[in-house]
């Protein structure tokens, strides 16, 4: 059996552009792609923290260090510039692989620069 586990996420990034007439995708600062291990053209899920929208698209690389988080094409209709989003990618793996796998979690500041990284999410308390 294969499991689908969170591979990587960019947590609470700020949307910098929403380009309706650009070919569909999300352009992500290249440094964030490298930090997460998300590859160009990989499917990603977008969860808009501001408005609750949830959808999927694919990642393309934006200029390194630019802070760009640009939703393009039809995806641009689901967000507004300034919205906070989570970008997540998943990977399929065996149960044995899943036992030792750790996701790449990247947390960013208001300018979409990396503030810190982690490989686990703290336990949620009551």
Swiss-Prot record:
GO biological process: alanine biosynthetic process; pantothenate biosynthetic process
Location(s) in or outside the cell: Cytoplasm
Active-site positions on this chain: 25, 58
Pfam families tied to this protein: Asp_decarbox
Binding site for substrate: 57, 73-75
Entry cofactors: pyruvate
InterPro entries given in the database record: Asp_de-COase-like_dom_sf, Asp_decarbox
Reactions catalysed: L-aspartate + H(+) = beta-alanine + CO2
Modified sites of kind Pyruvic acid (Ser): 25
CDD domains attached to this UniProt entry: Asp_decarbox
GO molecular function, one term: aspartate 1-decarboxylase activity
Protein keywords: Autocatalytic cleavage, Cytoplasm, Decarboxylase, Lyase, Pantothenate biosynthesis, Pyruvate, Schiff base, Zymogen
Enzyme nomenclature, EC number: 4.1.1.11
UniProt pathway annotation: Cofactor biosynthesis; (R)-pantothenate biosynthesis; beta-alanine from L-aspartate: step 1/1
One term under GO cellular component: cytosol
Family: Belongs to the PanD family.
Subunit structure: Heterooctamer of four alpha and four beta subunits.
Function: Catalyzes the pyruvoyl-dependent decarboxylation of aspartate to produce beta-alanine.
Name listed for the protein in its UniProt record: Aspartate 1-decarboxylase
Organism: Xanthomonas oryzae pv. oryzae (strain KACC10331 / KXO85)
Lineage per the UniProt record: Bacteria, Pseudomonadati, Pseudomonadota, Gammaproteobacteria, Lysobacterales
